[in-house]
Amino acid sequence: MITVDSSVWIDYFNGTHTLQTRQLDHALDDSSHDLVLLDVVLMEVLRGYRYEQEWQLANRTLSALPVMTAGSADVARAAAAMYRQLRTAGVTVRSSIDLLVGAWCIQQDCALIHNDRDFKPMQQHHGLPVLA
């Protein structure tokens, strides 16, 4: 199973070509991978559109994917614990949503495609599975 952070979806919809958007293209084309979308990522991506036509295009594309709920009580507790452990190690994760995404991916053993520095310490210290 694979999921994609908003940092990559935003680049993808903006037409920015990166390693991560190429990985996303491959995941969209390859049905052997279960590509899922987290509810919090859906919100992060869609909230940024000012123009209705762009919002409609992104919403239509994202609606084709199964949406998973990231914010269960177990995931919230795991995200809070991970934040505290990283702070103790001298690392501050800036985004609570990134903590939820990371904790969900760790619990589900779901590979994450991202382009966001907040996920690096989660990978290094907590074994966040990432698609490389």
Where are each of the predicted segments found?
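Amphipathic alpha-helical recognition patches that constitute DNA-binding helices
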Residues: Q23, S96, L100, D118
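Histidine- and aromatic-rich ligand-binding microenvironments
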Residues: D5, L37-L38, R94-S95, D116, ...
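Short, hinge-like loop/turn segments at secondary-structure boundaries
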Residues: E52-Q56, L86-R87, P129-A132
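Active-site neighborhoods of divalent-metal-dependent phosphate/nucleic-acid chemistry enzymes
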Residues: V67-I113
